[in-house]
Amino acid sequence: MKKILITGSNGQLGYSCKEDLSEKFDLICTSRSRSKGTLQLDIFDKNAVSNTLKKFQPDIVINLSAFTDVNGCEKNPHLANKINFEGVKNICDNFDGHLIHISSDYVFDGRDGPYDEYSKTNPISVYGASK
């Protein structure tokens, strides 16, 4: 059975992923805060990310960790960048498998939709730029 490591598994998308994937995959569920059935993993901690990926050797990582408060990102762009960019970079720097990263339509300016994964980005907010 393939192993999937899910970051941010305690969020809304995380719960849905766990429900939809648990019967077909071996799931390693992580979150910044500890909870039942979830390993604590701070994706800003390069060593913790590296050690977790080495220990579990997942086939796939689904990154659901994100700072999703759009107004909060505007008020604290440093934190938005740390969560939505630097944490993802830590995963990419330590993982050669398949990464599924959830982005946002905020990476676009809203002028030329509908968009797909090949559309050129043009964020108009801190949140969009951080994603």
Predicted regions and their residues:
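N-terminal Rossmann NAD(P)H-binding glycine-rich loop of SDR-like oxidoreductase domains
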Residues: K2-K24
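Rossmann-fold cofactor-recognition segment
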Residues: R32-N47
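Catalytic helix-loop patch of NAD(P)-dependent Rossmann-fold dehydrogenases
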Residues: K82, E86-G87, V107-K131
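NAD(P)H-binding glycine-rich loop region in Rossmannoid oxidoreductase-like domains
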Residues: I43-I83
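Conserved glycine-rich Rossmann-like NAD(P)H-binding loop of the short-chain dehydrogenase/reductase
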Residues: Q12, F25-R34
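NAD(P)-cofactor binding segment of oxidoreductase domains
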Residues: K75-I100
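SDR active-site strand-loop-helix element
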Residues: T7, T30, V61-S65, L99-S104, ...
